[in-house]
Amino acid sequence: MLVGTNIRNWGPTATPECLVACARYADQSTLDSIWVNDHIGLPPNFDHNPYGISPDMAHMLDPLGIACFFAAVTSRIKFGTGVLILPYRPALLTVKWLATIQTLSHGRFLLGTGVGYLDEEFRALGVPKRERGKINDETLALIKAAVDSDILTSNNEPLVVKPRLQPPPIYIGGAPATALPRASRVGDG
């Protein structure tokens, strides 16, 4: 059995000192992995709280930036996103981030993905929420393609993108009705 834990990348504990202490402690422990969350921000006067989100989550450090940080301050432990909301980011840029993280960490990154749910975040980013599943699947397809080729096509424009992505394990989060079929198609766990 593998055991991981979430490290808060939000609220008052989202400081370099706390993150490095937690990551190094986990690296020296018997834990297998550490995980961070993803939100861009929260609406002011956040009053609809379907998932127990704290208002402190408005102060959240970016999970991909933290992954680079973890790569630099640890040597053994795997680390991942629980979950990275793929529709919030351009697909090609996400692939580049993942390739960079995998290179810096010598392949220790774990990619947990999801489609997101906060209407306000989608509107603020100019991403149609109704297209989140489609965007998510297109991004996952590009991630899979990046494992097999240095030439990727985005918006009908082929580009050589290096370093080639070392395949991270892909974990699919979300509501069972949509997440389970997606997990069976493209997920690793």
Model-predicted regions and their roles:
Residues 1-189:
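Active-site-adjacent structural elements that line small-molecule/cofactor binding pockets in enzymes
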